[in-house]
């Protein structure tokens, strides 16, 4: 549990996620501001259905991605690599996520894009501030944590 707490604290301080989808052998990546839900271990994003990545995702799809800072030295590198699933939210689930998203990013109130959830199933957190190449791994299904 400590690994997930450490990762969640770091993710809560960031705000841009990159994720990639695949359809029929074609890959595409996208970036978006996110709201991280530590309880569900999920990102919430807004993206229009007409975008290439949303079209490739359909109502849900497997994804992989990253969240990282932009440090000037290797010793300060910190970042997450993940795999999981993206899905478009509907109804009350969408309304609740949008309310929380709009609270974090008030400018989003002007947007009508649908809300999507990226559920994280595996996370690898690299934190060179704890020593070069220091990794922490969290897996949803097994509850496994490695430091």
Curated annotation (Swiss-Prot):
InterPro entries: Split_barrel_FMN-bd (IPR012349), UPF0306 (IPR011194). Belongs to the UPF0306 family. It comes from Shigella boydii serotype 4 (strain Sb227). It comes from the Bacteria. HAMAP family: UPF0306 (MF_00764). NCBIfam families: PRK03467.1. The gene is yhbP. This is UPF0306 protein YhbP.
């Amino acid at each position: 549990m400590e690994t997930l707490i450490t990762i969640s604290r770091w993710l809560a301080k960031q705000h841009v996620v990159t994720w990639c989808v695949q359809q029929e052998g074609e890959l595409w990546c996208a970036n978006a501001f996110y709201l991280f839900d530590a309880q569900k271990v999920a990102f919430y994003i807004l993206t229009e259905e007409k975008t290439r990545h949303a079209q490739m995702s359909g109502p849900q799809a497997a994804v992989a991605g990253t969240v990282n800072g932009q440090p000037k030295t290797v010793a300060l590198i910190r970042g997450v690599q993940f795999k999981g699933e993206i899905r478009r939210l509907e109804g009350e689930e969408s309304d609740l996520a949008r309310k929380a998203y709009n609270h974090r990013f008030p400018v989003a109130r002007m947007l009508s894009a649908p809300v999507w959830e990226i559920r994280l199933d595996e996370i690898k957190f690299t934190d060179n501030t704890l020593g070069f190449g220091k990794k922490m791994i969290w897996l949803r299904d097994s509850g496994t944590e490695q430091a």
